[in-house]
Amino acid sequence: MPTLLLSLGSNLGHRATTLATACDLLALALGDRGRISDCYESEPVGFVSEHRFLNCAARFECTLPLADVFARCRHIEKLLGRTQKSHNGHHTDRPIDIDLLAWGDTVLDSATLTLPHPRLPHQRRRPGLEAHAPQ
């Protein structure tokens, strides 16, 4: 069963509530309670904003096909107010962002998804990402 690593972030609205809701919805959608890291704050990456991000990481054991996982993550983003991944190719403030960081040992580079995520080495150095640690 592949291990799914996700990075979640929010820099608009009630960030902590949004992240908690996203994690609950992910557990339901993926069929696994998962392991969720502590939250931490960060500056936006790739754009300037006065709004800092609240972030966490999540680890799930999942039997769903990768395409279904990707679609369910996008659906949860939409449910929580996300309208687009970027605006004219530029990142913007958002109520929720769910990034797939890794799916087991899968290596993929498509128009919609790159695995492992290009920022995964950077993400692993973040404090509080104990969700990445082996069980």
Regions found by a protein language model. Name each.
Residues 1-30, 36-41:
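N-terminal beta1-alpha1 ligand-phosphate binding loop
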Residues 9, 61-63:
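Solvent-exposed residues in well-ordered beta-strands and their adjoining turns
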